[in-house]
Amino acid sequence: MNKINFTSKSTIIFLMLFLLFNTSFSQNVPVLKITDLKKRIENNSDTTYIVNFWATWCSPCVKELPDFDSISKIYKDDKVKVLLVTMDFKEEVKSKVLPFILAKKLYSEVLLLDEVNGNYFIPKISKEWSGAIPATLIVNNAYNFRHFFEKKLTYELLKTEIESVESKIKKK
């Protein structure tokens, strides 16, 4: 009887920890609408935002994520912020996105864009964007810097873009 009691208690504790673990991680992937994302990146701060649009099922996207993470780590003490905006479905946060983030050990901030109408949200990011991913917007509003890329980016190109913003800052 004691053995069954101990097993039942262990199961209950395990389930409680499992639920707590899952809940805390789901809070680490904020679900945003395009208006929320735009408010975040279109403020007048002198922070340079590197906003990468990707998905767990997109092979070129997955291949470039380590470069974005490297940039995020290198510039962690500077006014450079990498935002990895996944285009996965919000219903897949726990089943796909979180396990992916943990498996890849992503350092950068991950957000989920909860939009289904591409005709609505795509032009709000860039009129140049067809909707294909990977896509990246690099923006610094204080210095009128805005570059959009609809392709896989390399570490070298990301570093060059950041240096371009920094040179504008030094000129002012």
Question: Where on the chain are the PLM-derived regions?
Answer:
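Short pre-active-site segment immediately N-terminal to redox-active cysteine/selenocysteine motifs
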Residues: 47-49, 53-57, 132
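Conserved redox-active cysteine motifs that mediate thiol-disulfide chemistry
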Residues: 53-67
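Conserved helix-turn-beta segment immediately C-terminal to the redox Cys motif
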Residues: 65-86, 102
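Thiol-based oxidoreductase modules, predominantly thioredoxin-like and allied folds used
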Residues: 79-94, 106-116
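Short, internal strand/loop/helix patches
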Residues: 100-133
